[in-house]
Regions:
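Short, charge-rich amphipathic interface segments used for partner binding and complex assembly
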Residues: 26-63
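N-terminal acidic leader/helix
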Residues: 1-28, 58
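Short, solvent-exposed, charged loop/turn and helix-capping segments
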Residues: 2, 63-64
Length: 65
């Protein structure tokens, strides 16, 4: 795989991760301060994991030749 196509693929993945993060936060916010706040706790964990994944993709992009 050429570095150009790898960069494009990683950029697409980064965009998808950002979109998923926004969607997770939107759902979590609907359950915040409700009796179902345990749902928010789980989704906040998912958000943190997605942020970690986004940073990993960014590091991979920086390491491309």
């Amino acid at each position: 795989m050429s570095s150009g196509s790898a960069e494009a693929e990683l950029s697409t993945l980064q965009s998808q991760i950002e979109e998923l993060t926004e969607r997770i936060v939107a759902v979590a916010d609907r359950y915040r301060d409700t009796p179902d706040s345990a749902i928010t706790t789980e989704l906040d964990g998912a958000e943190r994991n997605l942020l970690t994944a986004r940073r990993a993709v960014e590091r991979a992009q920086r390491n491309l030749p």
